[in-house]
Amino acid sequence: MPRSLKKSPFVAYHLLKKINQMNKAGKKDTITTWSRSSTILPSMIGFTIAVYNGKQHVPIFISDQLVGHKLGEFVSTRNFRTHIKADRKTKR
């Protein structure tokens, strides 16, 4: 269910503050964050944001196609490892 149009999109305050400071300074450094629920805004385009997946920070380059999505959509938290196929020699 999408967020109500009466409300503005959710962005963590500390993340928005860092982006605004870096826009004023003209820097494009990597920003680390744990806020997976923050919405990507047009002011974030061109930045690299490292989002925490539970183990490490995964960098995401923000482009215009990602605007409106959440940061957590692009970083997987679960790692599926394929099942080991049974070796025929060990079954004998």
UniProtKB/Swiss-Prot annotation:
Keyword Protease among UniProt keywords: no
InterPro entries assigned to the protein according to its UniProt record, in alphabetical order: Ribosomal_uS19, Ribosomal_uS19_bac-type, Ribosomal_uS19_CS, Ribosomal_uS19_SF
One BP term from GO: translation
Keywords: Chloroplast, Plastid, Ribonucleoprotein, Ribosomal protein, RNA-binding, rRNA-binding
Family listed: Belongs to the universal ribosomal protein uS19 family.
PANTHER family: RIBOSOMAL PROTEIN S19P FAMILY MEMBER, SMALL RIBOSOMAL SUBUNIT PROTEIN US19M
Protein name: Small ribosomal subunit protein uS19c
Native source organism of the sequence: Phaeodactylum tricornutum (strain CCAP 1055/1)
